[in-house]
């Protein structure tokens, strides 16, 4: 080996050859600066600076050693950078990884950790406490399964060093792997729970689960509504998979929308299950209930069973009554009457037997003579009237309705036959409000060029039923308001209509037997021929014989009769025998209409009442008018009709 520049011969050369020749000179320390002094140095030696001369690079450029030295420095720098990077990857991790999550966020405050926007996958590690999101263990597992699926793929590439570091901290005892297996099983179980609500026969599974939880079938508590549009006030609702916090809050949230609520809550592997009996403030359909409860409970509508309760089932009422007494139910509001009626002893003993006389009295007071109207209106009183409730519980409703209408007609017919025409007009006027104007009728007669005084005179004889004067004929072209005028008067007087189309029947005149006034509308030439042949006695106002179905011939005095026609019988000599039996008024002008198509002159019951009261002195006399005024001041003094037996208090 050649002598290196700056290297002295002797011991230094041997030392350089022994070390491999990588250093140039071996320095000998004679004296150091600073506060510490080596023990092998002499205190009195003088520092000449000769040891610093050897550190100066005095070699010549171009000797071939620049490139190896630069390469050596570069390789050392790369090795140092790789070592530092490995240490960073080993001991420094992402803020979202489980090893760097703050204990305040993950362990001490799980609810604060639950609202984080970006969350990574938590590695399995030893924990002092189980995580609690505030929504129950089932919902935590479901949420974890949904959030951990993308986390696995996210940490595949860069999570190896983190895993190694955690295994080193865990001591390598395999506990992390066991905990990870448990979380994997929980994720699979949560995925199975979510798949339960996606099956095709979901309703069957819900019904099975309901019976498993509550111990009875859902169909034993409810009655089925096929239509989702049917309205009902009481509903039984069973909701599955509800959040724990929502299940507790629904006890308060449902109170503003209902008057009664019975809530039971059960827990299963599907989550919270809520059974409710709710009475809303107004009737709702199943579609409306499902929509509102779906928003309130934050679950899909298909996860609910909604049907109305069995209100006439004693076991069903007893179930709600007994469960309401336990501590497993939350009850709000007043208990429905159908539960009280079937469970409380006092109400059960107060159930009354059905009384037909009360039904007849109700129909008479409300002036109902139609069977369908009576059946419907009386059934609506089932929740208020005990007799109506007993009527609904009876198996002979059709028979009761028919008998009640028959008796009501008998009472009405006898009451009507007992009254004179003046009393009947007064009786009909009591049912009409005092808001009419008689001038509308007078203006209409003046518009049709009918003199008022002759009309009042004819109307007076007509209402009294004077022979030969009890038939008024209104003649004129079409659209002149003849039928409008006569129908309005007939409606106020409560009369009946007969039609010539039924003249082939023996019973077409039978409506005249139960009325005070009759009307034959739109009589044609054939009708006048029939009247001239068979009904001359009817126009006279004398007693006639009427054939009524399933009864013997009835003899009675024919009531006053009004006839409308387009033919003037006074101009036809064929009907000369009818001229003395009828009074004819001509309506020659078309009935005026306003922009809405309504008649300009209003002919209603209120106006007719005002008309009769105004012209009562000319029609009936001053005595009847004074009697009418006394009734207006003092009220009706006669007792109302009563067909219900009174209660007699008997002494002991």
Swiss-Prot record:
Residues 185-351 are annotated as: DNA-binding region. GO terms for biological process: DNA replication. It is an enzyme of class 5 (isomerase). Belongs to the papillomaviridae E1 protein family. ATP-dependent DNA 3'-5' helicase required for initiation of viral DNA replication. It forms a complex with the viral E2 protein. The E1-E2 complex binds to the replication origin which contains binding sites for both proteins. During the initial step, a dimer of E1 interacts with a dimer of protein E2 leading to a complex that binds the viral origin of replication with high specificity. Then, a second dimer of E1 displaces the E2 dimer in an ATP-dependent manner to form the E1 tetramer. Phosphorylated. A motif (Nuclear export signal) lies at residues 108-117. GO terms for molecular function: ATP binding; ATP hydrolysis activity; DNA binding; DNA helicase activity. Keywords: ATP-binding, DNA replication, DNA-binding, Early protein, Helicase, Host nucleus, Hydrolase, Isomerase, Isopeptide bond, Nucleotide-binding, Phosphoprotein, Ubl conjugation. It is found in: Host nucleus. This is Replication protein E1. The keyword Cell membrane does not apply. ATP binds at residues 476-483. The keyword Transmembrane helix does not apply.
